[in-house]
From Swiss-Prot:
GO terms for cellular component: membrane. InterPro entries: Ig-like_fold, Ig_E-set, NXPE4_C, NXPH/NXPE. It holds the Pfam family NXPE4_C. It is found in: Membrane. The keyword Transmembrane applies. It is a single-pass membrane protein. This is NXPE family member 2. It comes from Mus musculus (Mouse). Belongs to the NXPE family. Keywords: Membrane, Transmembrane, Transmembrane helix. Signal peptide: none annotated. The keyword Amino-acid biosynthesis does not apply. Its main location: membrane.
Amino acid sequence: MRRMLSPRILLSSLPNASARKLFLIVLIIFVFWVVFMTSKDHTEFMVHLNNRIILRRWSIFKEFLHSEELKNTPASVEAELAVTAILEKLNQQIPPRPFQTHSSTTSAKQSTATIHNPQRTYCVGDQLNVLLVAKDYFGNRKEYGGDFLRARIFSPAMKAGTSGKVTDFNNGTYLVSFTLFWEGPVSLSILLMHPSEGVSALWRARNRGYGKIIFTGQFLNGTSPVLTECGLTLNTSAELCQYLDARDHEAFYCLKLPGVPCEALTHMTSKNSNISYLSLEEKLLFRRFNIGVEVVKNLSIVVSLCNNKTNKKKKKCQIGMETPSPGGYTLKGRWITAHCEQNEFRAIKDINNCLTRKLIYLMGDSTLRQWIYYLPKVVKTLKYFDRHGAGPFKTHILLDTERHIFVQWKKHSHPFVTNKLFSMKDDNYIPREIDQVAGDSGTAIVISFGQHFRPFPINVFIRRAINVKNAIERLFLRSPETKVIIKTENIREINEHVEIFSDFHGSIQNLIIRDIFRDLNVGIIDAWDMTVAYRSEDVHPPESVIESQIGMFLNYIC
């Protein structure tokens, strides 16, 4: 029978000490490898290590940090202080307004609106002021402000309209100011969107929690899809997949599925939950017939040209200009800015000349995706490039290889609210996307986000806006000639999901955007003002509005 060789015999058979030392090292490595390969975690570790190397440059969400928490740095502390300061300012502007009965809240029917200092003749360029006195359902004058109002003047026959500026005196009275931009008969509209008591309730409910939306993540377990709960925060002691951006203090979580690596996250979807942070009494304020009720009773005027030849020559529209309120008006269905001179870009030749050798990055929600749907209808040489993927939320690319035009739309990252399944494989936050843009004089970035943030506490939106601002500042350090444009939110339809998607939330976010980006050399496309002027009450405005937005964009970059 053959005798087995022992390690001692093997060592003695080696010619010298160096050979014996090398043999021992190889033996130790072999033993370690055997132990590791028989352990239950080796497969997950290898997948994790391999994915970390391959995918790190593509997506921040492929960095799975088992134990690392978001740590404070001087930059993150400064950002959190800025978030807190903005939140405190907003809390002061929207104080609690408890109420006993619905009858004690603001009534559009009982409130009055009268023209302040009425004139016999109104001329183009004049200001029209309307004094609004808020009253409750008993006809008693309100002693505090805070009502959410939407003001507009319009002339249907001329397809003309513009928004009004509301000044709240915080005592139940409001001054609503309009600029008379066109001649002819003009009608007035002031809608009570929500009474101050409803505004207070929406603000409290918004900042109370994250439970109004349920996220579901789809992971790949081998070749089979498996589902689990996800969210911006999860109240559980179970093991979590943590998708953390440590620099920007952004976080998203999913419940860890047994045996499924966190890197196997492929898709996401969401739905509205049954959770509400409103009381039964507060919910009565948001029945459809209580929202967007007209205050004005048949107010109209006639505006004359008055031989007005004092129009000042306006500067050409350019990035960095301060946009007033209102930012412009519609006339014959076309948007006209109030503060700068526009080129019309009606001829396809002019549009092509503007876009030639341009790299255009559209970063944001589906209201920006409308741009990439509209452009090929006008510029026939722009063709879709199949970047694979499926569904409306995949990255869209348009190319004109002859004129060297590149246009890309990519959705923003969490939170993204939709019941349609969307891919997470190349998902990224806007600040990280900006960091990857080289930038030059032929590069333009358009950013728009907000609609998907409305269901969540306002600090989520504030933090994202600050992170976007910081990324733009970094971009300007390396490529100051790059053009950056911010498209604000637009108004949307009124539906039963007021607690989640009310335009009140959007109006607050618009104020925040203007505050955070006020000192940056960026262009502003005031989609809010445009959609009020057009009275486009749809989350996805019609093509006439999209055309006006793109027209403003072309004025900024050319």
